[in-house]
C-alpha cells in the first residue's frame, strides 16, 4: 500500500489505539476542545465533511468509559445559570424526536436542552459529505434506511408527516438499479480464488433462492467440484434435507438449530463453503450462521426454505417471510430525519427555506445550535456523567464538555442515550432495573464510505452490490442513488462517486458462544483496530475485487470515512439464546421503567434496532413525563 490517506485523516482515528485513552481518566476532564473544520470552508465547524475515523470518534467516548470502567468522574461541577423544562441526554433520532413530541405537547416556548457526547447530532444517523469540483457527494454514516414505514405506529407516522417526508416520492426518486432497495437489481458474489477474487455469474440473491440459472452461477465459483454439486442440489429445492423428521420435529429443528448446523450437518457443506451465504446474515444479526437459528437466517434472505419440505408452509404462515417489506432510502441514510428535526426545533440553523425538498443539499450552521435565545438548545461534545432528582423535584444533570465539568437543572430529564451507560448515570436506580438494562449488548458495526475519482471500474462489474462473505467488509455497494432532498447522484461512470462498504467485526465463533458474548468481543475488536488497519483492509479488498476491471486504489481513492460503531444496533432477542418472557417481564421492559422525573427513550428500550422504535420510545417517554 504505497499511497495512504493524509496524516490529518490518519490522526483523526489512530490516536485511540486500543480504544483506551493514552491519558488517565482524570486527565480527560482537563482536555481542550477538539478542533473540527470544514475542508471546503476553513475554520468553519462542520463535522459531516470530516474523513478518517468517525462514528465513535476520538473525544466521544473517553469520559463515559472512565465512568463505566473505573467509576471516575469530576468531583466538582460549575452550576450554570440555566434551567430547562426538559433536559434530554442524547441528540440522536430518539432524543430529537423526544424534543419534538415534548414541544408539540407543551408549547413552542418550552425550554429544552439536548446534550450529546459526539461532535455532531444524529446519533447513529450520521451523514458523510465529500466534495469534488463543486459537486456534493453524500454517504451513509450509520443508520441506513426506513424499513417498511407503512407499518410504523401512528405516532411514528405522524412524526414523518410533521417533517414533510413524502414516502411516495422516496419510492419514485431512487434508481431501480440499487440492489439494497430492489433485490431484482443485479448483485453478485465475490470470493477469493487461486488467482484472486472471482465474481460469480448471475443475480446472487436470485441464485440463493433457486431462481435463474443456478447451475451456471454455482459452476462459476472457485469451489471444489464436490461442493459445487452439493450447492446445486441444495439450491434447486429438489431435496428435503429434513425428511427424516416428523412435521413437529421439523418445526422444532428450524427454531432451535443454527443455520450453520443445517448447512454443514444436513446439506453437508464444508465450513468455508457455508460462509458464502453469510453476508446478509452478518449485516442483519451481526453474527454469522453459527449463531442464528435456521428460521432467523431464512428471514434474512438466506437459502433453504425450498429445501425443508412441508414445514416451509408453516414458516411462511407464521414467520411472514413473503416479500412484503420495503426499504426506503435518503441519499445520506437516515441522517435526513435528524436534520429535518433539528431544522424544525432550531429554525435558524439554516438560512431560508429548508424542508424535505432540499434538505439533502442544505448547509447547517452549527453555531446556531446552542444559542441562549433558542427555546431548544443542542449542545455537542458534552458527555453526561450523572442525572438525579433533587429534593425540590427538579433534576440535576452533570456533564463534561471540553474538559469542563458543568451542571444544569431541568424539571424533567429523558435519557435518550446508550442504555448501558444509564446505571452509571443513575446509580439510585433499583437493582432489578439495572439488571434489566445490563442484559442486552449492542451489536458492533463498521461502515465505510469511499470517495472515488470516478465510477468507471465499478461500473464494469455490472452490478450495484457485491457480497464479499470472506472479506473484512461483507458488502460493497454504492451510496443511495436517489434525488430525494435535492441530491444529484452520479449520472455516468465518469462522475465521482461514493462506494459504501458494510461490515461487522469478524470474531471467531465456535457456535457455543452467545451472541451477547460475541458482541462484547466484537466491540473490543472495533475499538482496538486503528484507522490505518481499516484503511489497508479497504484498499486491499477493493483492489482484489475491482482490480481486474481497471481499479487502482493508489490513484482512484480520494478519501475514506470510516464509521465505527462499537455500540451499534440495539440488541434484539434471538431464538437460540433468549427465553420467551411474559409481557412486561422482558429485560428491556423492566429496564425502561420510569424513575420519577427521569424516563428512558432509545431503541434499546424497545429491543428493536430500527428508526420507528427510536421514535416510539420518544413518544412513550414524553407521555410518562407529561401525563
Say what each PLM segment does.
Residues 34-75, 129, 192-195, 400, ...:
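Conserved flavin/dinucleotide-binding core of flavoenzymes
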Residues 139-150, 245-252, 323-332, 433-439, ...:
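Active-site rim elements
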Residues 72-252:
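N-terminal glycine-rich phosphate/pyrophosphate-binding loop and immediately adjacent elements
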Residues 2-85, 104-109:
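Extreme N-terminal leader/targeting segments of oxidoreductases
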Residues 374-376, 380-510:
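Mid-domain catalytic core of redox enzymes
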Residues 236-382:
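Active-site/ligand-binding neighborhood in enzyme catalytic cores
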Residues 42-49, 122-154, 299-320:
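Glycine-rich active-site loop/strand segments that organize a redox cofactor
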Residues 85-100, 115-118, 380, 384, ...:
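Conserved beta-strand->loop/alpha-helix structural units within folded catalytic cores of enzymes
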Amino acid at each position: 500500500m504505497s499511497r495512504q490517506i493524509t496524516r490529518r485523516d490518519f490522526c483523526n482515528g489512530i490516536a485511540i489505539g486500543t480504544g483506551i485513552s493514552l491519558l488517565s481518566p482524570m486527565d480527560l476532564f482537563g482536555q481542550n476542545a477538539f478542533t473540527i473544520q470544514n475542508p471546503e470552508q476553513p475554520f468553519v465547524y462542520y463535522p459531516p465533511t470530516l474523513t478518517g475515523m468517525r462514528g465513535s470518534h476520538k473525544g466521544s467516548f473517553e469520559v463515559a468509559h472512565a465512568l463505566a470502567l473505573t467509576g471516575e468522574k469530576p468531583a466538582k461541577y460549575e452550576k450554570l445559570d440555566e434551567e430547562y423544562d426538559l433536559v434530554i441526554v442524547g441528540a440522536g433520532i430518539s432524543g430529537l424526536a423526544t424534543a419534538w413530541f415534548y414541544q408539540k405537547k407543551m408549547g413552542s416556548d418550552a425550554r429544552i436542552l439536548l446534550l450529546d457526547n459526539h461532535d455532531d447530532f444524529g446519533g447513529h444517523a450520521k451523514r458523510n459529505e465529500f466534495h469534488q469540483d463543486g459537486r456534493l457527494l453524500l454517504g451513509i454514516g450509520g443508520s441506513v434506511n426506513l424499513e417498511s414505514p407503512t407499518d410504523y405506529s401512528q405516532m411514528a407516522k405522524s412524526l414523518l408527516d410533521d417533517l414533510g417526508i413524502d414516502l411516495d416520492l422516496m419510492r419514485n426518486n431512487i434508481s431501480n438499479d440499487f440492489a439494497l432497495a430492489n433485490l431484482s437489481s443485479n448483485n453478485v458474489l465475490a470470493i477469493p480464488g487461486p488467482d484472486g477474487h472471482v465474481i460469480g455469474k448471475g443475480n446472487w440473491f436470485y441464485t440463493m433462492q433457486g431462481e435463474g440459472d443456478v447451475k451456471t452461477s454455482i459452476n462459476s465459483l472457485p469451489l471444489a467440484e464436490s461442493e459445487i454439486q452439493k450447492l446445486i442440489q441444495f439450491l434447486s429445492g429438489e431435496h428435503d434435507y429434513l425428511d427424516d423428521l416428523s412435521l413437529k420435529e421439523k418445526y422444532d429443528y428450524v427454531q432451535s438449530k443454527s443455520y450453520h448446523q443445517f448447512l454443514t450437518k444436513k446439506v453437508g457443506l464444508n465450513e468455508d463453503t457455508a460462509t458464502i451465504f453469510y453476508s446478509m446474515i452478518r449485516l442483519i444479526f451481526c453474527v454469522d450462521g453459527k449463531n442464528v437459528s435456521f428460521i432467523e437466517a431464512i428471514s434474512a434472505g438466506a437459502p433453504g426454505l425450498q429445501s425443508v419440505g412441508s414445514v416451509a408452509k408453516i414458516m411462511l404462515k407464521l414467520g411472514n417471510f413473503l416479500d412484503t417489506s420495503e426499504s426506503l432510502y435518503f441519499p445520506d441514510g437516515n441522517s435526513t430525519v435528524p436534520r429535518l428535526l433539528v431544522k424544525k426545533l432550531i429554525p435558524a440553523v439554516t438560512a431560508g427555506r429548508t424542508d424535505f425538498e432540499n434538505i439533502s443539499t442544505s448547509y447547517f450552521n452549527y453555531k446556531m445550535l446552542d444559542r441562549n435565545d433558542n427555546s431548544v438548545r443542542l449542545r455537542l461534545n458534552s458527555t453526561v456523567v450523572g442525572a438525579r432528582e433533587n429534593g425540590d423535584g427538579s433534576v440535576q444533570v452533570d456533564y463534561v464538555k471540553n474538559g469542563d465539568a458543568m451542571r444544569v437543572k431541568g424539571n424533567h430529564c429523558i435519557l435518550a442515550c446508550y442504555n448501558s451507560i444509564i446505571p452509571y448515570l443513575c446509580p439510585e436506580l433499583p437493582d432489578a432495573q439495572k439488571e434489566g438494562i445490563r442484559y442486552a449488548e449492542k451489536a458492533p458495526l463498521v461502515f465505510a464510505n469511499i470517495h472515488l475519482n470516478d465510477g468507471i471500474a465499478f461500473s464494469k462489474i455490472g452490478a450495484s452490490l457485491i457480497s464479499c462473505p470472506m472479506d473484512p467488509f461483507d458488502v460493497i455497494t454504492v451510496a443511495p442513488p436517489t434525488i430525494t432532498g435535492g441530491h444529484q447522484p452520479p449520472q455516468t461512470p465518469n462522475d465521482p462517486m461514493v462506494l459504501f462498504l458494510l461490515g461487522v467485526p469478524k470474531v471467531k465463533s465456535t457456535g457455543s458462544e452467545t451472541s451477547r458474548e460475541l458482541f462484547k468481543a466484537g466491540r473490543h475488536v472495533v475499538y482496538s483496530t486503528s484507522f490505518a488497519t481499516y484503511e489497508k483492509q479497504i484498499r486491499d479488498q477493493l483492489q482484489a475485487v475491482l482490480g481486474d476491471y481497471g481499479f487502482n486504489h493508489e490513484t482512484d481513492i480520494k478519501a475514506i470515512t470510516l464509521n465505527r460503531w462499537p455500540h451499534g444496533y440495539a440488541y434484539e432477542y434471538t431464538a437460540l439464546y433468549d427465553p420467551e418472557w411474559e409481557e412486561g417481564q422482558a429485560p428491556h421492559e423492566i429496564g425502561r421503567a420510569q424513575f420519577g422525573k427521569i424516563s428512558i427513550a432509545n431503541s434499546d428500550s424497545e429491543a428493536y434496532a430500527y428508526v420507528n422504535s427510536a421514535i416510539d420510545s420518544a413518544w412513550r417517554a414524553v407521555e410518562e413525563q407529561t401525563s
